[in-house]
Amino acid sequence: TDQAALAQFGEHIVLTAAQLPKVANASPLVLPLTFRSLAALEADFTLFVHVFGPLEPAGQQPPALLSQWDGWPLHDNFATSGWKAAERLGFRVAVPLPANAPPGEYRVELGWYESSTGARLPVSAAKREIHDNVLVLGNFILSEN
């Protein structure tokens, strides 16, 4: 695996950089992400980002899905089937946050699925939590506007 990899999705997509703000107070939540392909990709995969919360104290109900974003990189203009080997791609994902979302701590997760089937790519990551083929990117605080 890639030394700089935060996570690998399937056989060929590597997340090399991700910036999650510590605090956010306005919609949308902007996430700069950088991916690299280990080989040319033949299929189209869709990136998804989920925001859960607010996070309850440990042992309480699992947090609800607050918001999500699904799409292709670069405003849906760069399908993964066009990625070449060693393609490096940095772009921002803007996840809308509801105006009435209560202040508190929220969790961000992301992953990829095959556009035609919806099947999620398996995820591997050395230092981050994974579940259900989803990478837990981290938490942020939503403050009062």
Predicted regions and their residues:
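C-terminal luminal/periplasmic domains and tails of membrane-associated envelope-modifying transferases
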Residues: 1-145
